[in-house]
Regions:
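Extended beta-strand/loop cores of jelly-roll/beta-sandwich
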Residues: 6, 25-215, 325, 345-375
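Bacterial Sec-dependent N-terminal signal peptides
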Residues: 1-36, 220
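Functional-site microenvironments in short loops/helix caps that host divalent-cation chemistry
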Residues: 37-45, 67, 73, 78, ...
Length: 375
C-alpha cells in the first residue's frame, strides 16, 4: 500500500471517529425525535406539540452578560494573612446563568422606588404582594444616613444630602440597602418583566432575577480563569502604566490613587473575561448564601448554596427575629487589596445597611450551555 493512501485512510478514520463522538454529544443537531404531523394520533408526542406552543429561546436580559457553565476550584487563590481558614479550595461545577454587567445603580434603584412611591400612590403588579408605602420606606428605601453612621468623625453630610438622588450620582452604585431590600428588588424586577411579557403577546415567563450564590459570584468574578487572584487575572493591582485596576484603598489613609475618594461610576475600570465590571472594589456585593465559616466543605459540589436552617421556618420563610449573617464579596472603595481577591469571604447581617455594600442580580439560564450559543 502506498504511503499516501495509508494517510488518506487514517485521516478518513479519524474524521469518522470525531463525527461519531460529537454526534453522541448532541453537537451536530442529532437527538431530537423525528415523526409525522403535529397531531397526537394516538401517540405520545408531547403536550407542546398538541397545543402547538412556540419554542423557548431565552433572551439575554437587558444589562446582563451570559456566563457559561463550567468547573473551577473555589477558595483562596493566595495566602490567608489573617489565618481565617474559612475558604479551603474545593472543585465545584456552576450551571449557566446571566449576571448584571455592573452593580445596580442609583438610577436603576430609583425606578424601583418610584414604582412603589410614585405620585399616584404606587402601582401594583399581578400576583405580587402589596406593600404599603410605610413598610416600603422602612425596609426597602435606601438609608442615606449610612455616610454618617458608618464612619466616626467623618464629614459625610454632602453624601447624605446628594448621593442617593442627585443626577450627578445616578450612574454610581446604590448603597444603604440591606440584603432584604436587594432580595425584594430581584422579586419586583422579575414580576415587572414577566407582566410585560404576558401583556405583550403572552410570552412565557423568564426565570427569576435573584442575588447570585456565593459560588456563582466567585466563578463569575474569575472570568473563566480557574485560580485567578483578582478578576483581571494577574496578581497585581496596577497595570503596566501604573494605573490602579479597581476602586479600593491602596494604602494607609490613601483612598484617591485610583481616581475616586469614595465610590466610582459603574463601568469605569476594565471588565474581566466574562465582561463583568467592578467585581473587585467600588462596593461589596450581597450574595444569596447565609454565612457559615465552614460552609465550603459542607455544601455540595454542584451549584452549592449554604442555607442556615435555624434562620427559616418549616415552610422556608425567613424568621424575622433571626438576624442571619449573609455573605458579601468583592471588597469596596474603603477596603485594602486583600478583600478584593476573588476568594476572600466576609459577611454582614441581613438587615444591615452600609455605605460600602451594594448588589447585582443573576438569572438562571434554562437549558444546556456550552458557551457556544453566545458567540
Amino acid at each position: 500500500m502506498k504511503k499516501t493512501n495509508f494517510h488518506q485512510i487514517l485521516i478518513g478514520a479519524l474524521i469518522a471517529a470525531v463525527g461519531a463522538s460529537t454526534s453522541s454529544c448532541g453537537l451536530l443537531g442529532i437527538g431530537k425525535k423525528k415523526g409525522g404531523g403535529g397531531d397526537a394520533q394516538g401517540e405520545v408526542v408531547g403536550q407542546s406539540t398538541i397545543e402547538r406552543r412556540q419554542g423557548w429561546a431565552q433572551i439575554i436580559p437587558y444589562g446582563m452578560v451570559p456566563i457559561p457553565a463550567g468547573t473551577f476550584h473555589m477558595g483562596q487563590a493566595d495566602e490567608d494573612p489573617a489565618s481565617t481558614q474559612i475558604n479551603f479550595n474545593k472543585q465545584i461545577t456552576i450551571g449557566p446563568m446571566f449576571m448584571d454587567e455592573t452593580e445596580i445603580t442609583n438610577d436603576e434603584y430609583l425606578q424601583f422606588t418610584t414604582f412603589f412611591l410614585g405620585a399616584e400612590g404606587g402601582a401594583q403588579l399581578t400576583n405580587f404582594p402589596q406593600v404599603s408605602q410605610q413598610e416600603f420606606m422602612a425596609k426597602y428605601y435606601p438609608d442615606t444616613t449610612v455616610w454618617m453612621k458608618d464612619f466616626t468623625h467623618h464629614m459625610g453630610d454632602p453624601l447624605v444630602d446628594y448621593y442617593w438622588q442627585h443626577p450627578g450620582y445616578q450612574e454610581y452604585p446604590v448603597v444603604g440597602v440591606s440584603w432584604e431590600a436587594a432580595n425584594f428588588f430581584g422579586k419586583w424586577r422579575t414580576a415587572f418583566l414577566n407582566e410585560w411579557r404576558q401583556v405583550n403577546g403572552g410570552q412565557p415567563p423568564m426565570p427569576a432575577f435573584r442575588l447570585p450564590s456565593e459560588a456563582e459570584w466567585e466563578y463569575a468574578a474569575r472570568g473563566g480563569r480557574d485560580m485567578a487572584k483578582y478578576p483581571w487575572g494577574n496578581p497585581y493591582i496596577r497595570n503596566s502604566k501604573g494605573c490602579m485596576l479597581a476602586n479600593f484603598k491602596p494604602g494607609r489613609g490613601n483612598y484617591y490613587d485610583d481616581g475616586f475618594a469614595y465610590t466610582s461610576p459603574v463601568g469605569i475600570y476594565f471588565p474581566n473575561d466574562y465582561g463583568l465590571v467592578d467585581m473587585a472594589g467600588n462596593v461589596s456585593e450581597w450574595c444569596l448564601d447565609d454565612f457559615y465559616p465552614a460552609s465550603v466543605p459542607t455544601v455540595w459540589d454542584l451549584n452549592p448554596q449554604f442555607i442556615d436552617k435555624a434562620a427559616y421556618d418549616k415552610q422556608g420563610n425567613s424568621i424575622e427575629k433571626y438576624n442571619a449573617r449573609k455573605v458579601i464579596r468583592g471588597g469596596s472603595w474603603k477596603d485594602v487589596a486583600f478583600f478584593l481577591e476573588t476568594g476572600t469571604r466576609t459577611y454582614e447581617y441581613k438587615d444591615s445597611t452600609r455605605a460600602y455594600i451594594g448588589f447585582r442580580c443573576a438569572m438562571t439560564n434554562l437549558g444546556r450551555s456550552s458557551g457556544s450559543e453566545f458567540q
